[in-house]
Regions:
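Conserved CoA-thioester-binding segment of acyl-CoA-metabolizing enzymes
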Residues: 1-50
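C-terminal long alpha-helix characteristic of the crotonase
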Residues: 110-115, 166-202
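Glycine-rich phosphate-binding loop at the start of an alpha helix
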Residues: 74, 97, 127-130, 154
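Well-ordered beta-strand positions
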Residues: 44, 93, 108, 147, ...
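Hydrophobic, secondary-structure "cap" segments at the distal end of domains
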Residues: 134-143
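Hydrophobic/aromatic residues within transmembrane alpha-helices
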Residues: 13, 47, 59, 102-104, ...
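Glycine-rich beta-to-alpha active-site loop
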Residues: 79-124
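Glycine- (often His-adjacent) and acidic-residue-rich active-site loop
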Residues: 30, 34, 41, 49-82, ...
Length: 202
């Protein structure tokens, strides 16, 4: 349910459970975390999904069985944030719930026009993963973060772009090409220089 393609310093992870809107199981989260933790030599990392949805969040059956409070979510986002190369979320469709943590942990987020963004954690009776509100607030500010997490608002791709939650809106056929193009300079650069710039950017 997870595919990994590695080519010349670029690691591309694809969530590959389109029949379930790429809903994340514990096994998928564990595999994703292991890949991200192993990506210390990756010069670029792209995360995308198969089908028309990036991810619907956690698998509903597993969420009620304890996945909602699993440490795997935080382990995954921490591992993505620690990747030394440029990390890009290429959002091929809607991004919902706990899957938001993956995108927030990336350096750059690109999305298709039909993507929607929502995080209904409060409605379902759970707290978000600890780093998610902090990363979201750093991008869009506390008030807009509360609009999503507490107000239950669903954003369109254009609203997400205006808020600063994503950096570009692209047609589906251009999404991965643009992600690869953005990563190409970092892949070609000196690793030390790339790491230095990444550190200076915060």
């Amino acid at each position: 349910m997870i595919t990994l393609d590695r080519q010349e310093g670029l690691w591309k992870i694809t969530l590959n459970r389109p029949e379930k809107a790429n809903a994340l199981t514990a096994a998928m989260l564990r595999e994703l975390a292991e890949i991200a933790e192993a990506a210390r030599q990756a010069r670029g990392l792209i995360i995308t999904g198969a089908g028309g949805v990036f991810s619907a969040g956690g698998d509903l059956d597993e969420m009620t069985d304890g996945l909602a409070t699993s440490a795997l979510w935080e382990r995954l986002s921490t591992a993505i944030a620690a990747v030394p190369g440029l990390s890009i979320a290429a959002l091929n469709g809607t991004l919902a719930g706990g899957a938001m943590g993956m995108a927030l942990a990336c350096d750059i987020r690109l999305a298709v026009p039909q993507a929607k963004f929502f995080y209904p954690v409060m409605k379902r009776g759970f707290l978000p993963q600890p780093s998610d509100p902090l990363r979201m607030s750093a991008l869009i500010g506390p008030a807009r973060t509360k609009l999503i997490l507490m107000g239950g608002q669903k954003l369109t791709a254009q609203e997400a772009l205006q808020f600063g939650l994503i950096e570009r809106v692209l047609q589906p056929e251009d999404l991965l090409l643009n992600a690869e193009n953005i990563a190409s300079d970092t892949i070609a650069a000196s690793p030390e220089i790339a790491r230095g710039i990444r550190t200076l950017c915060g």
